[in-house]
Amino acid sequence: MAAAAAHPIVNLNCFSFLIFVIIRILNSINITSAIPRGRWELLQQSIGISAMHMQLLNNDHVIVFNCTDFGPSSLSLPDGICRNDINDFFLQHHCTSHSAEYDVFNNSIRPLMLQTDTWCSSGAVSPDGTLIQTGGFSDVGRTARIFQPCATCDWQEFPIELSAPRWYPTNQILPDGRVIVIGGQENNYEFYPKSLSISSTITSLFPITLLEQNSNLYPFVHLNVDGNLFIFAYNQAILFEHTTYSVVTTFPAILDYQPRTYPFTGSSVLLPLRNLLQQSVEAEVLICGGAPWGSYQDATSGNFTQALNTCGRIRITDPNATWTMETMPLPRVMGDMTLLPNGQVLIINDAVRGLAGWGDPVFYLVLHRPGNKNGSRFQVQNPTTIPRLY
């Protein structure tokens, strides 16, 4: 049974951890065939924690972390270290880890110490490879966390770094190396570290009207080739100039007008840039899945609507940009999309119905090949056996 989440969550893996290996598809294989492809390899039966958030770093290690207050994990902290937080609702004292470092090459796990609750936080990786994670649940919404890759490094946590509490925000790295933190129960944004040009007498919070009118929870944000930000919320998008705090372009609504951001929870990627040698580089955004309008009200009454099976694609560098729509092989809500080294897009996880979780999982992966013609871009891969959704 699918259901609306009792507590909303980021759309990432939330059950036992599985690193997958997709075997390269040979050119001789007929790509129009409906036969699923790829092979799964189980590397760890469990790493001891749930993978709510995951980030691959530049040393080929994956940082995995989860909320800290829903119960002890199966991974103990080292050297008698324990976590104490009198403000937690369920778990004020325990000695288990809610974060781990996975070494891809050695297939090994190292427990990490998280004091603050990263539930529904957001992050980005800086140019030097440092993971910057901001926001979180309850009293830690203004927290910033730093993880620098090294053999013995652990989380560094700074409780009052943000100007406003952030829960369900989105982070995006900027050309100057700073991170912009957008939304998250707020219809505004701020920078981390804060801009040196901002006077202490001037607020460092800047409103975005789009987020007032739509959802400000986990908006989709991508850095355009001109330095402006593509921001998508609910079913609409803008191109935003973050240095002048102005809207450069208002894009048309996605053609089916269906909502895609949390809690309707589709997924989005900036497609690989393909014409880097030309004078004007083109940039395209792909948004897939989600839940139809009205599904939130339906879920509260026990009716779990089928997820969307459509994708929208838009070339955000065009002066008169328009959406084109595609149909996926399967409906998906609360999935993940990631770019592969060959320029293809992997669509993974999800539920078939409901919103923001959590039953009726989609086991089949899908490859999206953006260079193919519309109608021949999707290729179903062999299924996993493990549900991965909230």
Identify the role of each PLM range.
Residues 41-49, 112-118, 159-166, 206-214, ...:
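Short loop/turn motifs that recur once per blade in beta-propeller domains
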Residues 59, 67-69, 128, 136-139, ...:
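Short loop/turn segments immediately following the C-termini of beta-strands
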Residues 50-54, 60, 97, 119-124, ...:
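Beta-propeller and closely related beta-sheet repeat lectin domains
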Residues 29-43, 55-114, 134-151, 212-354:
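Beta-propeller domains
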Residues 68-93, 288-305, 350-362:
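Short, conserved, GDST-rich strand-edge loop motifs in beta-rich repeat architectures
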Residues 95-106, 142-152, 187-197, 236-241, ...:
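Beta-propeller blade signature
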Residues 141-219:
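Asp-box/WD-like beta-propeller blade repeats and closely related beta-sheet repeat scaffolds
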